[in-house]
Amino acid sequence: MIIFYQPWVNALPSTPRHASPEQLEKTVRYLTQTVHPRSADNIDNLNRSAEYIKEVFVSSGARVTSQDVPITGGPYKNIVADYGPADGPLIIIGAHYDSASSYENDQLTYTPGADDNASGVAGLLELARLLQQQAPKTGVQLVAYASEEPPFFRSDEMGSAVHAASLERPVRLMIALEMIGYYDSAPGSQDYPYPAMSWLYPDRGDFIAWSAEYRISTPFVR
């Protein structure tokens, strides 16, 4: 039996927009055009992507480090930006910057990787720019992950898995920005893996979904 849990929440009022649409688009275009493809077999483009991300993090005033992801075909790198206190609990927000490839009719093809996941990286870099204007009281770590897509998906060789295994500070909250760039307001544009979910959730793909483990106990600050 499958049970769907629909939390009782109220919509929050709109807040002023501070992120730059122009910068979001600039990042997506750079990743999907200038350094395309960003698949595992295109290490030069992945390294150029990592350098671009690193430069934005540095310009935001973060403490920036590169973390080696020691897997075959590398070197792949996670780019880590720290804000706020250097010890104590962490809030981690991450997004992978590689893109997928596949074989179609025995031909290797590369996805542009715009929604998956240049959009997540663009959001991550805008968070970096916004954090430049803040002084967080809790440590915040922004991480651009390498090696999320196959052949590394769901393995210990994922960049996110390597990063998680290296953490020594307690993690209060982790948010992964994944495919946040696609929008469709047409009726029926949103479907779900289980038909019953359509009874609980909108039929238009004009929202960003927040999914989490139901047992999460950390309170969220609005």
Short names for language-model regions:
Residues 30, 78-82, 90-96, 139-145, ...:
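Soluble periplasmic/extracytoplasmic beta-strand elements of cell-envelope proteins
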Residues 1-4:
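Hydrophobic membrane-insertion alpha-helices, especially the h-region
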Residues 29-88:
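A non-catalytic alpha/beta surface segment that caps or lines the substrate-entry region
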Residues 109-215:
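Acidic/histidine-rich catalytic neighborhood of metal-dependent amide-processing enzymes
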Residues 11-12, 27-39, 144, 201-207:
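Acidic/histidine-rich, surface-exposed loop or edge segments in extracytoplasmic proteins
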Residues 17-24, 39-50, 74, 90, ...:
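Solvent-exposed, acidic/flexible segments
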Residues 23-26, 30, 44, 48-59, ...:
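Extracytoplasmic/secreted proteins, especially bacterial periplasmic and envelope-associated proteins
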Residues 70-72, 85-87, 97-101, 147-151, ...:
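Solvent-exposed loop/turn segments at secondary-structure junctions
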